[in-house]
Amino acid sequence: MDYNGIDSSSVKTHVHLNEILNNDKVVNATLIENYILQLKNNRSIIFPDEQPNGSIGSNKFISLFIPTINSLLNGEHYFEIDPERVVISLLDAILAYLNIEEILSLYPLDFIINGLTGDSAICCMIIRLLRNNATSETTVKLFDETAILDTILSRYFEKNTTLNVVSQVELLISELVDLSSTVVSTKLLSTEFRDLYEHARDNEDKLVKFLDYILLLMPYILEKQFDLPKNYYVLSYSEFYENDDVLQVVLFIQFYSKLIQRINTFGNDTNIIHNIKPCLKDLISYFKTRQNDDIVQSFYANDIVDVLFHVSYSKVPELLTFNEEVVGQYELFKSYNLFLHLDCDIKLLSTFNPRALPLEIIEDILQEISIFNQKYFSILLNCIGSENVFNKLIPRLTTSVIGKLSFDMLYSLLLRMSEFEYSRKHLINGMPNIVSDYLANPPNVSESEIWNLKKDTLQNLLFSNTDLNVWHDPISKNFSLMCNGRKVQDILPQVDIADKSLQ
C-alpha cells in the first residue's frame, strides 16, 4: 500500500480499516471518532496540495479511503462490527468536503436512492449532503428529475421513522424554504405528492408529523401567496373534541400557536386566517370550559393561552379584528369569566398584550388583585407594557411599597420599567430614592438571577434615548463595574478573621 504523501493519522486509520476488512475485527470507535475530529478541522488532510482544476478521482486520499470504506459498508457483517456506525460518520466527514458533482462521480444515483431507504445513519448522511449542496443546479436537477424527494418524503411519513432521520428531513425542507428554492413549488407543493400528503393527513398516526411538515413549508406559502388545500391546516371539530389522545390534542393546539407566529412573521394570507378562524373560536370555547373540565384545565388551557398571546400581538389586520372579537364577543376578560385561582388565567393576564385590551377592563382586573402579591406579580409586569395602564398604576408604585419587595421582585419590576420610554422617564424623574438605592448605589447582590436582572436594567437605561440626568455617571460606573469588575488598585486590602474573639 502506497502511503507516500499521506499523514500519519490517516495512515493509522486506513491500516485499521484494512485490518477490519480482512479479519472482521470490531471497529475501534474511539480511534475513528478522534480521527474524524482531526479531519473536520483540517481540510489539508484530504487536500494537501490544493488543485482547483484537478479531478477528484486523482486525489490520493480519496482513492485510498473511499474504496476501503465502500467495501466495509457492503460487507455482510458491517453492522455487527460497527454498531456505532462510526465508519459511516467517517464517510460523511470526507464527503462533506466535496461538491455534489464530485460525490456523483464516486457514487451512482442508485446508491443515493437506495441509501435513503437503508440504515438510518446512511440515510441521514445522504440527506445532509443534499442539504449542504441545496444551492447547486445539479442538486436542484436531481430533486426535479429523480425519485430522491419521493423517497425522502415517503420515509419521513412512515410511522416508525427514527427521530434522527425525521430531523434531517426537516432541516432539508427548511433549507429549501429559506432559499426560496424552485423545488418547493415545482415538487413539494405540486400535485405530484398529493396522494402522499392526503394519506398522511387522514392517518391518525401521521397527522401530527404532517402538521409539522406544513409548518416547515408555511414561510414559502405565505410569502408566495400559495393556495394550499384548506384541509392541510384546518382541523375538524371531532379531531379536537372527540379525541381521547390528550398529547395529540396538545400538539394540535400548539400547531395553531406556531401557525399564527408564522403568519405574523412571513405574511398576512387572508385565506389562511379566514379558514382557521372557526378553529380558533373553537379553542376559545374550549378554554371557557376550564373551570369545570379538569382535562382542559390541566392539559389544554395553557397552550390555548399561548395561541391567544400570539394573536394579541399580531399586526395582521384580520387577526387584529379577530382579537377584538376575543375581547368583546367572547368576553374572555370579564371578571365573571376569569378564575384567578387558576394558573392558566394568571398566565393569560400575564402574557396577553395589554395594549389590545380596553383600559376599563384592565382597571377592573387590577382592582380585584393585590398586584404586589407574588402570585399576581407577573400580571403587574405585563400591564406596564401599556402606557395608559402604566399611568393608572403610578399612584400605586410608591417608593415605600417598592422598597419592601424582595430583591427578585424589585429588580424584575425595575427591569420591566427600563424597557419603555414612558416608564423609564418616570423611574428616573419620579422615583429618585429607588434609583439611588438600587441602581446608582445598589446593594451587593451575589445571587446570579438577581445580579443579571440588575445588570440588564442598567444596560437598558444606558443604551436608551432617555435622559438620565444626574444619574448617568453613577449608573454608567456601576454598569461598567458589573461588566468588567473592579480594578485591583481600587480594592481595599482586608484580612478576614475567623474567630471574633481575636478582634
From Swiss-Prot:
GO terms for biological process: DNA repair. Belongs to the proteasome subunit S5B/HSM3 family. Keywords: Chaperone, Cytoplasm, DNA damage, DNA repair. It holds the Pfam family HSM3_C. Involved in DNA mismatch repair in slow-growing cells. Acts as a chaperone during the assembly of the 26S proteasome, specifically of the base subcomplex of the 19S regulatory complex (RC). InterPro entries: HSM3_C, HSM3_N. GO terms for cellular component: cytoplasm. It is found in: Cytoplasm. This is DNA mismatch repair protein HSM3. It comes from the Eukaryota. CDD domains: Hsm3_like.
